[in-house]
Amino acid sequence: MYSLDITQQNQVARERGATPHNSEVESVAVSRDGKYLATVDCLWSDLSRIILKFWHWSEETNNFILNTQVEFPHYQGVRSMCFQPIGPNQTVPLLLSVGNDKKAKLWQLEKSWSCVSCLSFRQLSATGGGWSSDGSVIGLSFGHL
């Protein structure tokens, strides 16, 4: 069992007369080697926000450390995420995210994570995605299945 504070904000006591706004973790992906973690936390209110966070495992602290935060990685939420299986010749990790904005995105780590490709098909909704077992092929579904 492991505990990690993803949203880093839900501990504040409620202000008098104000409605508390708590973020919820809606999606989590862990790389097969356990070195990388991606989370999506959302706040659905008049202050709506979606944040994709990339975490790296630290052997020194024996803890995940936040590396990158991306606000609104997909403008209408994230359906799913998965890391590419890392092969023997691969040194750069990739994450595939599928959003409710009709797009799938590839994220790559350099010093920080950034979107390196945005994929869409005929204005159809992206409904799912995944990697082949060796990480060489991406499968995406668009539209009605």
Regions found by a protein language model. Name each.
Residues M1-L145:
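WD40-repeat beta-propeller superdomains and closely related acidic/aromatic-rich repeat-like regions
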